[in-house]
Amino acid sequence: MTQIVFVHGMFQNPKSWDNWVRYFSDKGYDCSAPAWPLHDGDPKALRDNPPAGLGELSLDAIYASIKSAVAGLDKPVVIGHSVGGLIAQKLLADGHVSGAVAISSVAPNAMLDFDWGFIKNSAIITNPLKGDEPVYMDAKTFHGSFANTLSEEHAAVEFEKTATHDSRNVLRDCMGSSGKIDLSRPHEPLLLVAGEKDEIIPADLNEKNFKAYENTGSVTDFREFPNRGHYICGEPGWEEVAAYIDGWLQQNRFDVDNRIYAPSAI
């Protein structure tokens, strides 16, 4: 049975994957959704009482935690959203997984885009004047940037269910050495997924990320979904995205006996 590990991104926790875990479990996959450090629990409780040390959380600490969760499994597939998508790409590059899906992924190697939404949101999060003060997510910001394709009322419901506060240092680290990946090396299958109306990670940046992979002998695919925002995994129509990914997994025959190359080749 193929194992799937779902990795959430900033301002979310494993709660955001509940529908996906059910969907892929019903398809016969063995699914898990580990929390980042300081992100386990009910999102509202985490918002009301932010964990001590949240503002100091680093990408390296998150990666180490997720890598540890993956290490106890049998070369799973990893599906990650946003920063979770970058973590998925790093796990793939480091040879820890048999395949990866990066949804609305933060791009490696400090790749940038001149989209105004991307610039604005990145600047707010990484503001150096804020030091280690966490980013406090609120319903208005969640609707304006994260769930911009939803109505204000629907976004408010999703905010209550899934939103958390987060560490500025995570995105800062993504832009530094911790976010670097050697894109010239061979890798096992990778799918990058983008949302047309994403205000946080523009589809153009996801496509740029896709085109930066240089090894023509490795499977690297890209799919953009129309009318989707950064909340692509939770907004109406998420089932279409999940079904496409399921089809891609089947097409690439994901199990540990059908790897493109042995780990020793990495």
At which residue positions do the language-model features occur?
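Conserved acidic catalytic loop of the alpha/beta-hydrolase fold
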Residues: 60-76
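Conserved alpha/beta-hydrolase
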Residues: 24-49
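Short beta-strand/loop motif that positions the catalytic acidic residue
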Residues: 186, 192-194, 198
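Gly/Ala-rich beta-loop-alpha elbow adjacent to hydrolase catalytic centers
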Residues: 79-84, 88
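Short alpha-helix in the alpha/beta-hydrolase fold that links the catalytic acid
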Residues: 202-212
